[in-house]
Amino acid sequence: MPVFDVQLANKYFEHPEKVTGSFTITEKLDGFRLATVIHNGEIKFYSRQGQLVEGFVEIEEDMKKLLKIASLSDIFFDGELVDMDCENISSDENYKRVTKIARTKGEKRGLKYNIFDVLYYDEFVNQKCKSKYVYRRTLLNMFDNAIKSVNNIIKLPHINILPVLYNGTDKSMIMKYLNEARDNHKEGIMINLDDKLYEFKRTNNLLKVKVMQDADLKIVDVYEGTGKNIGKLGGIIVEFIHNNSTYRCECGSGFSDEERVDYWNNPNKILRKIATIQYFKISKNDNRGYGLRFPVWTHRIRNDKSEISMN
């Protein structure tokens, strides 16, 4: 079994020029990434880092049914685990439930596997995809039709083929479906470029568009980075307000290399200043407090403000 990474998306708003020609929009799920490798009828599950994970007994049983229905033996699926009740709970609650179950030792029940990409087994083993997304989507649709064709006889409640929201060339549909995701309290959408191949790394062939909010927060501290950012700014500590109480959290994404050097050597340029931070949502943390999910530095220091504003 090769050591591998799954395909990871770059951010659409940083690479909007990459969307040319036909593309497919699907929902961005907020769960636990899971890759499935099927060879000679044997089913194995792997994390996004390519590590073997076990215990998904319900999904494995449904996958065995799918193998018989679709006459499969050698295939690679990529997808996301969500809670079985995900349609009736918030994205944040779904994420909490899924990660808790996925990290449980032994059997892991109560999850649904949403499959959003597929490769032939030899493509996976050689780590080289030969099929454009438009063809891979056709394969997924075939599996979806196979599942639906026997739905009255054989139930597969723990497997779902992620549906297409839009396919075409109209880029205005990106904001349309992003706004719908926001209104439905979803995390965002994914843009699959129809003429691109699956890559086992972060790539512009797949782009994510998240629903984000803005807040003007106070910078109260800085911290050093790790790895390539040793001796540079790793991020900032910001204060925000929730339910009339003040909380703190780290923000390490969005800084340019120049900013990381400058702000680490000259922290007073940003300390005690108000800056605009983007984030997905406010969520509870393990310390019974609150934090910001996916906070991102926007390069905007608000010299016209001195107070925190969550609006």
Functional labels for PLM-detected ranges:
Residues 2-51, 103, 107, 120-121, ...:
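Nucleic-acid 5′ end/cap handling module spanning
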Residues 16-150:
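Covalent nucleotidyltransferase
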Residues 308-311:
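Extended, charge-rich, solvent-exposed interface segments
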